[in-house]
């Protein structure tokens, strides 16, 4: 059973130190100390971050960012806990948090098209791909992404 709370300062340092291998290395983050200097990512006060635990293990985090008509949903997993079955449960909890904070607003996310494991997880949680894949540049580099939406 996952538990969660608002992400603490200490957790922001821990999460941004997570390192991924292979194709997933695009998800390696800028260190939190650097984010604090620029007001980016975990240092942006408009972001709503939550940390998820399985017992004493920090396994995931989410970010909810309210926009005018919808809410951006970001998700991250501790590298050693990827593919362990937490994704759907955590996504359902994230949807519940979103409905509580931002009632009536749909959620959306953007996921790299090659990340089939994540796409399947989001589809099982009720997200659907909208439109054609889009090429964009993010803080993690260039990529081709699906835009996925879950109605409010």
How would you label these PLM feature ranges?
Residues 1-3:
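Extreme N-terminal starter segment of soluble prokaryotic enzymes
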Residues 6-13, 17-82, 91, 97, ...:
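Acetyl-CoA-dependent GNAT
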Residues 67, 85, 96-98, 109, ...:
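Amphipathic, positively biased hydrophobic alpha-helical segments used for protein targeting
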Residues 72, 86-88, 97, 130, ...:
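Generic secondary-structure boundary signal with a strong preference for alpha-helix termini
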Residues 74-92, 113-120, 124:
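Conserved glycine-rich acetyl-CoA-binding loop
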Residues 104-108, 112-119, 124-128, 132-152:
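C-terminal "cap" of GNAT-fold acetyltransferases
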């Amino acid at each position: 059973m996952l538990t969660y709370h608002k992400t603490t300062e200490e957790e922001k340092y821990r999460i941004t130190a997570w390192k991924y291998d292979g194709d997933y290395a695009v998800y390696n983050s800028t260190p939190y100390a650097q984010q604090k200097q620029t007001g980016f990512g975990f240092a942006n006060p408009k972001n709503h971050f939550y940390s998820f635990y399985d017992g004493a293990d920090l396994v995931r985090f989410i970010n909810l960012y309210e926009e005018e008509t919808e809410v951006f949903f970001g998700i991250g997993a501790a590298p050693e806990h990827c593919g362990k079955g937490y994704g759907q449960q955590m996504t359902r909890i994230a949807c519940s948090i979103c409905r509580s904070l931002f009632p009536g607003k749909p959620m959306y996310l953007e996921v790299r098209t090659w990340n089939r494991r994540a796409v399947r997880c989001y589809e099982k949680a009720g997200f659907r791909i909208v439109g054609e894949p889009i090429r964009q540049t993010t803080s993690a580099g260039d990529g081709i992404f699906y835009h996925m939406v879950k109605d409010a």
